[in-house]
């Protein structure tokens, strides 16, 4: 597996409240994670850092999970535990009350990948030269779009675009979506925060992923492109291919 992680403050925000990285368990099986924090006074930074640290620390203590079913069970259970820890910590510190974070994570299982998500950080897969979104945004605007109350054009500039219906750290229990999809040698997995998807159209994202650039160059281009369109939020990108082997690493 070859992975490239990038995170950038963007052109407007003073702090980077995104977090993420690539982490391995005891059998060198990787998990890839992106989290986008929310809350004032750097609380979002605390929430996203906690989510990534707690989930990756739990993963580092496991041995290889070989089936998609095992991985789904582990993700559901562990993300609930992570959520409870964030809630408890936010309740213990006045400055952190109301903090929360999105989360999207992926674990490889033989010829498949298992993805878990909460919030509006997304997972995409480029397969057979076609980019498709795997995750569903847990946001007010997505719900209005899904029910036909607004158009796709309305959604792009909706005043309540940042309202989430699900996030880690908000309530004692959180609903986690999980997906199992085929992941072949020629495929590319993209995990990202909304600082990318709110800035760069999916048609351009697809063209970048289909290009002849290296995976590292593609990750850099995503950051540059989002900033060139305004860089209104923190931008985080994690790209994964399975045809190369690279030692896992973490970043924040």
Swiss-Prot record:
Cofactor section: Mn(2+)
Positions with a binding annotation for Mn(2+) 1: 36-37
Membrane topology term: Peripheral membrane protein
GO CC terms, sorted: cytoplasm; membrane
Main location: cytoplasm
KW Ligase (keyword) present: no
EC code(s) of this entry: 3.1.3.16
Ranges where the PPM-type phosphatase domain occurs: 2-242
Cofactor: record remark: Binds 2 manganese ions per subunit.
GO molecular function (one): metal ion binding
SUPFAM superfamilies noted in UniProt: PP2C-like (SSF81606)
Pfam families given in the database record: PP2C_2 (PF13672)
Protein name per its UniProtKB record: Serine/threonine phosphatase stp
UniProt lineage: Bacteria, Bacillati, Bacillota, Bacilli, Bacillales
């Amino acid at each position: 597996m070859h992975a490239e992680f990038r995170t950038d403050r963007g052109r407007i925000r003073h702090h980077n409240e995104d977090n993420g990285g690539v982490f391995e368990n005891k059998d060198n099986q990787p998990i890839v994670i992106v989290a986008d924090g929310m809350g004032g006074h750097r609380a979002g930074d605390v929430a996203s850092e906690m989510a990534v640290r707690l989930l990756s620390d739990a993963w580092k203590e496991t041995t290889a999970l070989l089936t998609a079913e095992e991985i789904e069970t582990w993700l559901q259970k562990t993300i609930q535990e992570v959520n409870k820890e964030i809630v408890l910590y936010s309740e213990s510190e006045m400055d952190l009350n109301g903090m929360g974070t999105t989360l999207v994570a992926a674990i490889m299982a033989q010829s498949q990948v298992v993805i878990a998500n909460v919030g509006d950080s997304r997972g995409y897969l480029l397969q057979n030269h076609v980019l498709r979104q795997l995750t569903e945004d847990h946001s007010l605007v997505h719900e209005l779009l899904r029910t036909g109350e607004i158009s796709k054009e309305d959604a792009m500039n909706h005043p309540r675009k940042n309202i989430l219906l699900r996030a880690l750290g908000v309530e004692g229990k959180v609903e986690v979506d999980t997906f199992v999809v085929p992941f072949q040698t020629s495929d590319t997995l993209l995990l990202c925060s909304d600082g990318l998807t709110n800035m760069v159209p999916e048609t351009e994202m697809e063209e970048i992923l289909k290009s002849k650039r290296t995976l590292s160059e593609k990750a850099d281009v995503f950051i540059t492109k989002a900033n060139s369109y305004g860089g209104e939020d923190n931008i985080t990108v994690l790209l994964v291919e399975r045809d190369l082997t690279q030692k896992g690493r973490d970043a924040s």
